């Protein structure tokens, strides 16, 4: 029996989606712009990286071909490999948001066909009645922020006041999200998580996709640092996903990183938390070593998005891609006949783009394994085809959206 390993490189877009203009993202290209900066020497950073973007292993799996499918051109400073070893394509999203739940749920075979609720960018972000309910039911003396903001910026700006007053820092973005930052020592991690659970219930009527706990440590703006204890409080997917179908079939669904949170723990039989891309890769390799026939291992590599995309750090994003690429031979050596790996993404987050939000982009679909023969699957019309490919490979019934690519 087969095994499937689904790796989401969070925010690794490869060119604007056909409907990017409706999102204000026409021209966004996470991979292309990173490569352009690297080729121009604008992403050199002493002690970190230098030169053109170097992704030999993903290129050999078809990344350059997928990027050319998405944009009609090769990324700057990069060339086609002599040979491609994987099945490759570029996928467009049909869900109506460019957020994490929409992307992941669609990858798992369940597109989001409704509109999320969003908080306004002008004036106070949150309705007064919601703030009052949070203070009353969450037992806090008030909130700070109440605006659209970058998480690191707002912690630097309001962190000391938060520590002094005990008021949590509450903010949002262009995504359907309510984020709460609080100090792990002065406010308490458990208290923050309890508050997020309260807010999750309160924002249901606003149709908000996620509440996110953003704990941090430090004593002043120069030392404030977000910790690895982030937690996402998502609503349930609107319909069963491939995770549910696998679980119902008695299969192992091993969620690594924030995958379990994204799916509100539905359809997950085992979970592993890890902090940082390399720790997530190590956890994935350990899971592969133990995975039985018929299992799905599903990992989200969050650093690309959280540390580099939103922070518009081109050099950091490039270095993270190169570090991930260098680990792929470790994965390849562990594969057995019947194994299939899929590398993809949930949306874009172009680190050269205006603002700090996600970008509406096509994503790569790179599939490989001992029994897969190299070919192109072209432009894929929905991320849902990825989930149906997993379902077909693992021998379970298909879902209502998408089709297998193999």
Curated annotation (Swiss-Prot):
Q: Enumerate the subcellular locations listed in this protein's record, separating them with semicolons.
A: Cytoplasm
The pathway that the record names for this protein is: Carbohydrate degradation; 2-deoxy-D-ribose 1-phosphate degradation; D-glyceraldehyde 3-phosphate and acetaldehyde from 2-deoxy-alpha-D-ribose 1-phosphate: step 1/2
Superkingdom of origin: Bacteria
- Report the EC number(s), separated by commas if there are several: 5.4.2.7
Which one of the record's GO molecular function terms can you name?
manganese ion binding
Q: Which Pfam families match?
A: Metalloenzyme (PF01676)
Please verify whether the record's keywords include DNA repair: no
Is Cytoplasm among the key words of this record?
yes
Sites where the protein binds Mn(2+) 1: 10, 346-347
Q: What is its main location?
A: cytoplasm
Cofactor annotation comment? Binds 2 manganese ions.
Which cofactors is this protein said to need? Mn(2+)
Which UniProt key words apply to this protein?
A: Cytoplasm, Isomerase, Manganese, Metal-binding
- Binding sites annotated in the UniProt record for Mn(2+) 2: 305, 310, 358
A single cellular component GO annotation: cytosol
The protein's job, in short, is: Isomerase that catalyzes the conversion of deoxy-ribose 1-phosphate (dRib-1-P) and ribose 1-phosphate (Rib-1-P) to deoxy-ribose 5-phosphate (dRib-5-P) and ribose 5-phosphate (Rib-5-P), respectively.
Which PANTHER family is this protein grouped with? Answer: PHOSPHOPENTOMUTASE
The family annotation for this protein states: Belongs to the phosphopentomutase family.
Q: What is this protein called?
A: Phosphopentomutase
Source organism (scientific name) = Sinorhizobium medicae (strain WSM419)
């Amino acid at each position: 029996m087969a095994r499937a390993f689904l790796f989401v490189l969070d925010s690794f877009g490869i060119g604007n989606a056909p409907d990017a203009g409706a999102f204000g993202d026409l021209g966004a290209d996470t991979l292309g712009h990173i490569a352009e900066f690297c080729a121009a020497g604008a992403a050199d950073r002493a002690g970190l990286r230098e030169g053109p973007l170097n992704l030999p292993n993903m290129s050999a799996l078809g990344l350059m071909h997928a990027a050319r499918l998405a944009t009609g051109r090769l990324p700057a400073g990069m060339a086609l490999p002599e040979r491609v070893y994987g099945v490759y394509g570029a996928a467009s999203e049909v869900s109506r948001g460019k957020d994490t739940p929409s992307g992941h749920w669609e990858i798992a075979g369940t597109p989001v066909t409704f509109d999320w609720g969003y908080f306004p960018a002008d004036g106070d972000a949150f309705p007064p009645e919601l703030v009052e309910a949070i203070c009353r039911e969450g037992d806090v003396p008030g909130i700070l922020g109440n605006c659209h903001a970058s998480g690191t910026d707002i912690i630097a700006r309001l962190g000391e006041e938060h520590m002094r007053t005990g008021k949590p820092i509450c903010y949002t973005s262009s995504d359907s999200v309510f984020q709460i930052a609080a100090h792990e020592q002065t406010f308490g991690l458990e208290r923050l998580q309890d508050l997020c659970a309260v807010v999750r219930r309160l924002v249901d009527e606003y149709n908000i996709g996620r509440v996110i706990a953003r704990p941090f440590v430090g004593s002043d703006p120069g030392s404030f640092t977000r910790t690895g204890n982030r937690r996402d409080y998502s609503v349930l997917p609107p319909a069963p996903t491939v995770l549910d179908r696998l679980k119902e079939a008695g299969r192992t669904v091993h969620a690594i990183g924030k995958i379990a949170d994204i799916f509100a723990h539905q359809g997950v039989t085992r979970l592993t938390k890890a902090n940082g891309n390399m720790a997530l890769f190590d956890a994935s390799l350990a899971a592969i070593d133990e995975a039985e026939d018929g299992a799905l291992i599903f990992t989200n590599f969050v650093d690309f998005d959280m540390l580099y995309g939103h922070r518009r750090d081109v050099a950091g994003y490039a270095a993270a891609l190169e570090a991930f690429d260098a680990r792929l031979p470790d994965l390849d050596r562990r594969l057995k006949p019947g194994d299939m790996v899929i590398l993809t993404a949930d949306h874009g987050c172009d680190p050269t783009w205006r603002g700090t939000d996600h970008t509406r982009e096509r994503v790569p679909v790179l599939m490989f394994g001992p029994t897969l023969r190299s070919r192109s699957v072209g432009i894929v019309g929905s991320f849902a085809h990825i989930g149906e490919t997993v379902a077909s490979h693992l021998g379970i019934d298909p879902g209502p959206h998408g089709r297998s690519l193999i």
